[in-house]
C-alpha cells in the first residue's frame, strides 16, 4: 500500500462539476493499493498517516500530528501510484491490485480511519475521474509504503 501524503491549507475533489469532498487545514492522501496488499497493511498505513508529526508547533517546528491539530483528511484512490515506468514510455500497472480487491481495501481503510479516529475523513469516488484541487502548505509531501520499499 502506497500513500502520497500532502499537507494542505485546503483541498477539494470534484466529479462532474459536483464537489464531493472539501476540507480546510489537514491532509490530502492519494492511496494506491497493490496486488500483494492485505488487511494488515490498513492499520499500519492509517495509523502512520494520522500520527505523522508534520504540522508546525508554536516554534515553527514540524512537531504536531493531524490528531493534535484536529485537522481534516481527504483520501483519494490512486492506482497509478503503482505505475512502473522503467521500461518503455508507457507505465505498466501490473503491480496494482485488481479493482475488486482495491475497492475492498480502500473501503476498509476509510472505515478504519472513521471508526478509530475523531477526525473528519472525506473521500473521492473509487474509479471515478476526479478533479483534485490542492493548496499545498509548505509544501510538505511525503511518500509512504507499507512494504517499506523506500
UniProtKB/Swiss-Prot annotation:
BP GO annotations: D-amino acid catabolic process
Motif Gly-cisPro motif, important for rejection of L-amino acids per UniProt: ranges: 138-139
The enzyme's E.C. designation: 3.1.1.96
GO molecular function: D-tyrosyl-tRNA(Tyr) deacylase activity; Gly-tRNA(Ala) deacylase activity; Ser(Gly)-tRNA(Ala) hydrolase activity; tRNA binding
Recorded GO CC terms: cytoplasm
Keywords: Cytoplasm, Hydrolase, RNA-binding, tRNA-binding
Catalytic activity: glycyl-tRNA(Ala) + H2O = tRNA(Ala) + glycine + H(+); a D-aminoacyl-tRNA + H2O = a tRNA + a D-alpha-amino acid + H(+)
Primary localisation category: cytoplasm
Localisation: Cytoplasm
The family this protein is said to belong to: Belongs to the DTD family.
Job of this protein: An aminoacyl-tRNA editing enzyme that deacylates mischarged D-aminoacyl-tRNAs. Also deacylates mischarged glycyl-tRNA(Ala), protecting cells against glycine mischarging by AlaRS. Acts via tRNA-based rather than protein-based catalysis; rejects L-amino acids rather than detecting D-amino acids in the active site. By recycling D-aminoacyl-tRNA to D-amino acids and free tRNA molecules, this enzyme counteracts the toxicity associated with the formation of D-aminoacyl-tRNA entities in vivo and helps enforce protein L-homochirality.
PANTHER family: D-AMINOACYL-TRNA DEACYLASE 1 (PTHR10472:SF5), D-TYROSYL-TRNA TYR DEACYLASE (PTHR10472)
Subunit structure: Homodimer.
HAMAP family for the chain: Deacylase_Dtd
Swiss-Prot/TrEMBL domain comment: A Gly-cisPro motif from one monomer fits into the active site of the other monomer to allow specific chiral rejection of L-amino acids.
Name of the protein described by the UniProt record: D-aminoacyl-tRNA deacylase
Source organism: Petrotoga mobilis (strain DSM 10674 / SJ95)
Gene behind this protein: dtd
Amino acid at each position: 500500500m502506497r500513500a502520497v501524503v500532502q499537507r494542505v491549507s485546503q483541498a477539494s475533489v470534484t466529479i462532474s462539476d459536483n464537489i464531493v469532498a472539501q476540507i480546510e487545514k489537514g491532509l490530502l492522501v492519494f492511496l494506491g493499493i497493490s496486488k500483494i496488499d492485505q488487511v494488515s497493511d490498513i492499520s499500519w498505513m492509517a495509523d502512520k498517516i494520522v500520527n505523522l508529526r508534520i504540522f508546525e508547533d508554536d516554534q515553527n517546528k514540524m512537531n504536531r500530528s493531524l490528531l493534535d491539530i484536529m485537522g481534516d483528511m481527504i483520501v483519494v484512490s490512486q492506482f497509478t501510484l503503482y505505475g512502473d515506468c522503467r521500461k518503455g514510455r508507457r507505465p505498466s500497472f501490473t503491480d496494482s491490485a485488481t479493482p475488486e480487491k482495491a475497492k475492498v481495501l480502500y473501503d476498509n481503510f476509510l472505515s478504519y480511519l472513521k471508526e478509530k479516529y475523531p477526525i473528519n475523513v472525506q473521500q473521492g469516488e473509487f474509479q471515478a475521474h476526479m478533479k483534485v484541487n490542492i493548496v499545498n502548505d509548505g509544501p510538505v509531501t511525503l511518500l509512504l509504503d507499507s512494504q517499506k520499499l523506500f
